[in-house]
Amino acid sequence: MSSVRPYPLPGPTYGPAAAFPSGVDTVKARDRRGRERAISGNRLTSWAFAEAYGEPDAGTAEGAALRWARERAEAAGVRAVSPGTGDALRLLAAATGARAVVEIGTGTGVSGIYLLQGLSPDGVLTTVDVEPERQQFARQAFRMAGFASNRARLIPGPALDVLPRLTDGGYDLVFYDGDRLECLECLGESLRLLRPGGLVCYTGVFAGGRTVDSGPQPTEVLRLRELLRAVRERKDLVPALLPVGDGLLCAARA
């Protein structure tokens, strides 16, 4: 499998195979290399700062709930959104004035806490997961974060069975963190649920860099590529691919 640098810097490739040719001022060349490394380091530091920027203090109820939910996710081997992705979800929910949100893939409640933070005070999160045990963790995390029980509706079951039962055009935002093999099939259902101007968001679309890797990839990565292409080509969507966490694909329904 080939490796990919998602943010390549301009300039020469350095390493054993890229020695300075004769006649080159090696002092200046090494200075340039040092500057490029500094730029790369500054970018990584900036991205790390941005990822942690909006994370609530661990001493608050929401911060403690997020930490607890992340620990449960790690123990269960469940993907959880990064703090930067959570910040983006909270912002998008708040910016759209969302009162009704669907989440596909409850997990242990990490992303749900961010979405509830961004929802209007009377807003409701409808969250779907095939594993009821995980939803029990999420329910406890929401309670720890201070959200009333009527703010979240947890529905167990496969997404493709549950989504058709939800109301057409009744939601402001649909967030997908479910089975990557079903991401494309769930797109149509997600758009049906959205009001005009509503948002659909998919997390994890970089797949750890594999989405843009030219080497052989598993089926789930191929499905993510199909999803990215389908969203970009639809005339009724306004898409953006945000470089937060493991990639957040968002699209507004025109």
Model-derived segments and their meaning:
Residues 1-173, 180-201, 205-254:
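A short alpha-helical cap/connector motif
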